[in-house]
């Protein structure tokens, strides 16, 4: 169906009480609607002028009856289209057979087009956003291309290096080409790559002429290359990437931080690299002579200083030890005394009230509370107890068949010295208050 300028589509269903063919249906549509309306809505004239489209008929004959689905495109306005649709329902015969026609639906094709436009526009926008290159990405791409152009080759081994390698007073030795590019991204143009674990002769020679920093990965491979560099080159400073990271995978901020934190080679070489230094023809004569006296002086000074400190502060240390021992002894005695006091109070509690166990047995599994005022025992529900709590003062003893919570303690701490409950759930206990669980009393 060529929709063209179609605005609406009229879907019609026809049932004929006999066998008919397509041309019979189309003839009935044009023949039985002719003259019903004004000439402006005559189907033949409308079709000639293109106001309505080609009428499609899908026909099926079943058991002596004919069933047709008729589709009629219309570019008329909604009022004229509605009149035209209603006109089709006036058809009552097709060929020699009686027929009934019902309008199934009038579809506004523009709604479908709008929905299609919306979905398609959404899809196109998503594609544009995916394909759109951010300004930052463009900038970085241009910078990257310039940096790639800036990378040079040095020496007979064609080692990758930055453009300032010849003119700079200092150089940075890295592992590979990718590391040189990474440093170029950070604006560092005096790096040169070893390109392998075997240090080229060019690196050995240039390290003697310039202030040299070895900047290696923070992994086992980086450590091996560093050892190789220390054996063969005149290294002045050492810097490592963060532990477990490679130089090429390190951010600009981290690289700058690592290079600022570079340490002199004298500080790196100790027991760990002693055998390397001893076998290094470059470092053995110059560096070891510089490091060894300084190291011996530091160790000797530390030993002397330690002996002097021991002589000066030994009496004070001994006195302090005696004081600490006394404090520990006093704390132990205090703890023992507290334990005795608690045990004594438990004993007094049992004696004073003619068997506290019996009191607790009386309220166990009842949900009631029992308290003693002036030697008189009183039993209430907890709700009733709370109602009269303002009138109750100076209790000798309070027991409840419920857990003792912080709220209960805050409520009763100034009314009784002893509180007993099924269990104690308190985070902060007042100094003068004793808390016991049923199990502690019943033991």
Curated annotation (Swiss-Prot):
Free-text remark on how the cofactor is bound: Binds two Mg(2+) per subunit.
Any Gene Ontology biological process: DNA replication, synthesis of primer
Keywords annotated in UniProt: DNA replication, DNA-directed RNA polymerase, Magnesium, Metal-binding, Nucleotidyltransferase, Primosome, Transcription, Transferase
GO molecular function, one term: metal ion binding
PROSITE patterns xrefs: TOPRIM (PS50880)
PANTHER family: DNA PRIMASE
Family classification: Belongs to the archaeal DnaG primase family.
Protein name per its UniProtKB record: DNA primase DnaG
């Amino acid at each position: 169906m060529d929709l063209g300028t179609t605005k609406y589509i009229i879907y019609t269903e026809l049932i004929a009480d006999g066998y008919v063919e397509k041309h019979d249906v189309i003839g009935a549509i044009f023949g039985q609607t002719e003259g019903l309306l004004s000439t402006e809505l005559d189907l033949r004239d409308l079709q000639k002028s293109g106001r309505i489209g080609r009428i499609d008929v899908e026909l099926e004959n079943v058991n002596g009856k004919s069933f047709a689905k008729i589709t009629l495109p219309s570019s008329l306005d909604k009022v004229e289209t509605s009149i035209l649709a209603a006109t089709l329902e006036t058809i009552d015969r097709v060929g020699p057979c009686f027929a009934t026609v019902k309008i199934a639906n009038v579809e506004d094709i523009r709604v479908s087009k709008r929905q299609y436009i919306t979905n398609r526009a959404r899809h196109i926008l998503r594609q544009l956003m995916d394909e759109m290159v951010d300004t930052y990405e463009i900038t970085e791409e241009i910078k990257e291309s310039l940096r790639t152009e800036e990378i040079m080759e040095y020496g007979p081994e064609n080692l990758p290096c930055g453009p300032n390698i010849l003119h700079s007073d200092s150089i940075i030795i890295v592992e590979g080409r990718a590391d040189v590019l990474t440093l170029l991204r950070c604006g560092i143009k005096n790096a040169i790559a070893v390109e392998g674990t075997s240090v080229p002769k060019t690196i050995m020679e240039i390290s003697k002429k310039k202030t040299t920093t070895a900047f290696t990965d923070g992994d086992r491979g980086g450590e091996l290359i560093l050892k190789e560099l220390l054996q063969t080159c005149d290294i002045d400073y050492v810097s490592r990437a963060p532990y477990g990271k490679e130089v090429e995978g390190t951010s600009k901020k981290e690289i700058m931080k690592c290079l600022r934190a570079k340490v002199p080679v004298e500080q790196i070489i100790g027991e760990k690299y002693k055998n390397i230094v001893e076998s290094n023809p470059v470092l053995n004569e110059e560096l070891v002579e510089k490091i060894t006296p300084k190291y011996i002086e530091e160790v000797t000074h530390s030993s002397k200083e330690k002996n002097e400190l021991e002589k000066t502060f030994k009496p004070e240390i001994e006195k302090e030890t005696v004081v600490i021992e006394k404090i520990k002894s006093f704390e132990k005695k205090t703890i023992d005394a507290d334990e005795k006091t608690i045990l004594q109070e438990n004993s007094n509690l049992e004696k004073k009230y003619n068997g506290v166990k019996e009191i607790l047995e009386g309220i166990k599994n009842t949900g009631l509370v029992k308290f003693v005022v002036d030697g008189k025992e009183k039993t209430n529900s907890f709700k009733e107890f709370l109602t009269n709590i303002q009138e109750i003062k100076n209790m000798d003893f309070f027991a409840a068949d419920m857990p003792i919570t912080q709220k209960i303690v805050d409520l009763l701490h100034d009314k009784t010295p002893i509180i007993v409950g099924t269990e104690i759930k308190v985070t902060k206990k007042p100094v003068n208050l004793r808390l016991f669980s049923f199990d502690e009393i019943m033991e």
